[in-house]
Amino acid sequence: MGIHEIYIRIWTVAFVGCMVLADAASAEESARDGVIRKSGNLRVPDHDAGDVAFLMRQPWNQKNNHRKSYYPAIFIFGDSLSDVGNNNNLITTAKATRLPYGRDFPGAKPTGRFSNGLIGPDFLAEYVGLPTPPPYLSAGNNILQGVCFASASSGILNSSGNVFGEHLPLAKQVTYFANVRQALQAMLGEKGTKNLLGKSLFYFNVGSNDYVTNYFLTNGQVPSLLQTQYTPSQFEDLLLSNLVLRIEELYAMGARKMAVVGLSVLGCLPAQRLIRKGSPTTCVESINEIVRSYNIALLNRIHSLQAAHPDAVFTYLDTYRFIDSVIRQPSAYGFENVLAGCCGSGRFHGLPTCSIPGLYKVCEDASKYLFWDFVHPTSKIDKLVIAKFWTGSYPDAIPYNLRELALVP
C-alpha cells in the first residue's frame, strides 16, 4: 500500500469514526474554551482596517425584501463555504446538522451551514434583496429567485472530497443547473428564461477542497498522490481548465453575469497548521504561495473569458488579501483569535470534531474568532467578506463589485 493510500485511509477512518460517535451520543452537549492565541510575526497590512465598522453596519434580515432586488435570481456554485443544506440529503460525513453548528443562526438551530450562524449566501441575498437561495436537493419548484448548488467537501475536480462520501462536484452542480433551466422554461418559456438568466447573478466559490482534501491531503513531508502526478503549476492549470469549462457550459445555457471568488489563505487553516505542525503565530507559507499563484492565474482566466464573451460580464472577487489583513491586524477588525478554531479539538482546534459530544470544546463568543472550526470561517468574517464583495473596489473586486455588476447592462 502506498503512503498516499495510507493517509487517505486515515482520514476516512477518522471522519467515519466521528460520524458514528456523533450518532451514538447527544448533539446538544457543549463546552467552553477560553484559550486565546494572538498572531504575530506577520507582514504590514495591505488593507485599511478602519472600514470594519462600515462593513459590519448592514444587518441581516430576510424579511427586508420588499425593495426591488438588484438581481432577479442568484445561482450559487461551490463547497461548504456556500452550502445551505444540500449535504443534509447526502450520505456523507461532511454534514453540519448538529449543534453547536448553527447555535447563532436565527432560531439557534443547525441547518447544514458549516458555521456558528449565517454564511456568505445569506448575507449576499440580503444585499441583493432576495431570500437565501434554497438548496437544490430540497428546492422543489422554489427556483424562480435562484438555487444554491453548493455542496460541502466538493471541488472543481470530481475526486476532491471523495474521502467524506457523497457530494456534488462542480460538474454535477452544472448538470443540476441544466435541470433547473429546463424547469424554468416550463414556467416562463424560452424568452422568459433567457431574460431571467441573463440578468441573474452566477456566483462561484469553489476550489478550496481541490487543495485541502486532495492536493494537500498529506502532511507535507510525504507527497500526496496528486503531488506525485502534478507540479503545483500543472495542478493549477488542471483546476482552472476544468473551472473554465464549467463556466463555458453555464454561459451556453444563458449565464451572463458571473462572479468568481478566489481562494483564501489556505495555509492559515487550523487543520493545515495542525497537520503540518505549524508555529503558534504563523501560517504555512508554502501553501499560501501556491494559493496566491492560483489566484493570479484565475484572474487571467477571467480576463480571457471576458475577451471571448463580450456579451457577458465576468468579475473576480478577492478574499485572500482581506483575510490576510485580518490575520495580520486582528484587533482592528474586532478579533482576538485568528489562528485557531472556535470549535474543535487538538492543536489550534484543527481536528474535525466540532459537534461530536465529548470530543470538542467551543468558545463562548465566536465573533472574536476568525475560524469557526478546523477549516470554516465564523459568521462574522463571512459578513465582512460579503460586504467587501458588495461595496469594495480594486483589488477586492476586479473589475466590478457585486453591486456594480448588477447595474451593468
Where on the chain are the PLM-derived regions?
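Conserved active-site regions of diverse hydrolases
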Residues: 2-409
